[in-house]
Curated annotation (Swiss-Prot):
Its main location: membrane. Residues 105-115 have a biased composition (Basic and acidic residues). This is Putative membrane protein insertion efficiency factor. HAMAP family: UPF0161_YidD (MF_00386). It is a peripheral membrane protein. It is found in: Cell inner membrane. Keywords: Cell inner membrane, Cell membrane, Membrane. It comes from the Bacteria. Belongs to the UPF0161 family. Residues 81-115 are annotated as: Disordered. It comes from Rhodospirillum rubrum (strain ATCC 11170 / ATH 1.1.1 / DSM 467 / LMG 4362 / NCIMB 8255 / S1). One of its GO terms (cellular component) is plasma membrane.
Length: 115
């Protein structure tokens, strides 16, 4: 394994570990306040796993910055390509509303997956 790849893998593992510690100890005290599905911590874990620690952190920070009462809400998946302008999403726009199936026709309006 190349040194840079090993460093990236180690940083990603550390970041995922910190998120799991947050989910285990701090999140139960704060309650479920996230306005998005998946929750911000699940989103961050998936983004780091799929895109590595650097792009994953960028996506997680962008998502957490939108998670406030005046921000968006609803279903907001991790994009396939995190590079700006290539994810097929609007950077400043809100996520799809919770009752809508727009952008994900396989998802039911009650928030459950069809199977």
């Amino acid at each position: 394994m190349r040194p840079l790849a090993a460093l990236s893998q180690g940083i990603g593992l550390l970041m995922r570990g910190l998120i799991w510690l947050y989910r285990l100890f701090l999140s139960p005290l704060l309650g479920q306040n996230c306005r998005f599905d998946p929750s911000c911590s699940r989103y961050a874990l998936e983004a780091i796993t799929r895109h590595g620690p650097f792009w994953g952190l960028w996506l997680a920070v962008r998502r957490i910055s939108r998670c406030h009462p005046w921000g968006g809400m609803g279903y907001d998946p991790v994009p396939d390509d995190p590079r700006p302008g290539r994810c097929g999403c609007k950077d400043a726009g809100p996520a799809v509303s919770a009752g809508s199936t727009e952008g994900n026709p396989g998802r039911r309006t009650d928030g459950t997956d069809p199977d």
